[in-house]
Amino acid sequence: MNAYGAKGQHGLPVRPGMTVPLPGPLHSHKDKLSELADMGYTDIWSAEADGADAFTPLALAAAWEPRLRLGTAIVPAYTRSPALFAQSVASMADAAPGRFAIGVGSSSNVIVERWNGIPFEEPYKKVRDVVRFLNDALGGEKVTKEYDTFKVDGFRLGIKPEVKPQILVAALREGMLRLAAREADGTIINWLSPEDVTRVAEVVHGAANGTPKEIVARIFVCPSTNT
């Protein structure tokens, strides 16, 4: 994965990253993470589907390898309650101050509805509401608010991270890309060609009104003895 955040396109640096967890048991990854940092990787990004959850590999990495920035790419907006979502994000941000970014997205009908039994409805609104709630909760305020897709009554985080984590939105279509630019710190993209990434950057930076936004792009590589 690459994160474009003040010397690549649009003045943002390129940060090479790797998807985690790597093969093998989680408890065996300490040396592998250090090797990634030694090789020049700056970020690691977790996912959440049918294997490890998104937070546990990053919590281990936070303790094992302080050189790496940590991010989720992504946590589904549907599969945690609002309060639990905020608690998980705040805990990771507290474990790795200034090194954690939370990526949130709609995920898919298979993961949300078929595997978790949650209706996969109004994905744009759901992601938007989770982003807005996280911004409210991570700011330390007591949240009593009715969002379009859920409501929260009197929740205040009992843990306030030293550094508020960046919030990134997984997006492919223009509506979600503009949401990421307007209400989050950037976007996470997947399954796109280099030419598509250029077009995505134009949409995101155009909607950001001059505010720098990070673009995290997942790149699939198939290494072999011939490459």
Language-model features, listed with the residues they occupy:
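Active-site-adjacent structural elements that line small-molecule/cofactor binding pockets in enzymes
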Residues: 1-227
